[in-house]
């Protein structure tokens, strides 16, 4: 089947980070994209990356389709990474991270979304918060790709 072999080009935006603290954005982006590329290298998908971050909760369809068009992408993923503060330190976060993703087609239609809560999944959270971001991102991508596989290829939506 010729359709199966087609490499899907997926455009990833920078994750929106909650709480909105400059200091944690850089490490979050790094951990997020490292998990994405680890994940996609095993698959026939190509990661495209834009340094743009758009609000997870108010996504404009036209913006998505413009980005997909300009980057020749088949899909777009808008991620969000939510941290939980613990203790009274300025940047003391627990290992619990929720990674949310919304998957859009090239026209900017929402196909599916998922939340991956590292705490709820009862992962034995060892190590750093960065590690949790990777685990969460990995989990969220797997969910999204599972959904993606359920979508039947049909001529008109270009899969």
Residue ranges, per PLM feature:
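Second-shell loop/turn segments in exported
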Residues: 16-25, 52-55, 126-131
